[in-house]
């Protein structure tokens, strides 16, 4: 993958329809980008060198999607993704609270929408190599009893090296 290629082809500011189509296919639902959000999370120096692209968008239903492309996967991919997803969820919470306060409206947790963390790996972490014929891995929190509570965070990991090996 080439940094400039990905950034040019999948730039939500200039070609939102491409990012919408990709996200629609990945999330298995129609996606419309409402706006591109600023990247506010600090990145460590070595992390920045491995990230090809990192885009955060607000979707039409006000959910948040973070689309990241990495040259090589990090150690502890689940923990890292959970931390960034939690950061996005907290940013959304603060933004929604502030917006409602400005409008002099009462806050409700119902206003907080889902956060999707989507990571494409050029060279995926070793955990993904145990599943060489699978290249899309979806995660969502589920109860062991069957009760359904929306915990707002979903993850999709895409191993491009596994895909190329199929």
What is each PLM-predicted segment?
Residues 1-166:
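Elongated, amphipathic alpha-helical interaction scaffolds
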């Amino acid at each position: 993958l080439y940094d400039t290629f990905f950034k040019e082809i999948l730039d939500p500011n200039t070609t939102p329809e491409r990012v919408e189509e990709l996200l629609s296919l990945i999330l298995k639902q129609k996606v419309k980008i409402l706006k591109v959000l600023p990247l506010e999370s600090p990145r460590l120096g070595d992390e920045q060198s491995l990230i090809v692209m990192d885009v955060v968008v607000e979707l039409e239903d006000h959910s948040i999607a973070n689309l990241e492309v990495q040259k090589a996967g990090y150690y502890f991919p689940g923990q890292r993704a959970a931390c960034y997803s939690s950061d996005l969820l907290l940013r959304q919470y603060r933004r929604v609270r502030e917006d409602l306060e400005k409008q002099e409206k009462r806050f409700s947790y119902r206003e907080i929408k889902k956060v999707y963390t989507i990571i494409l790996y050029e060279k995926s972490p070793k955990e993904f190599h145990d599943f060489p014929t699978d290249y899309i891995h979806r995660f969502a929190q589920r109860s062991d009893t069957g009760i359904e509570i929306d915990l707002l965070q979903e993850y999709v990991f895409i191993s491009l090296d596994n895909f190329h090996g199929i």
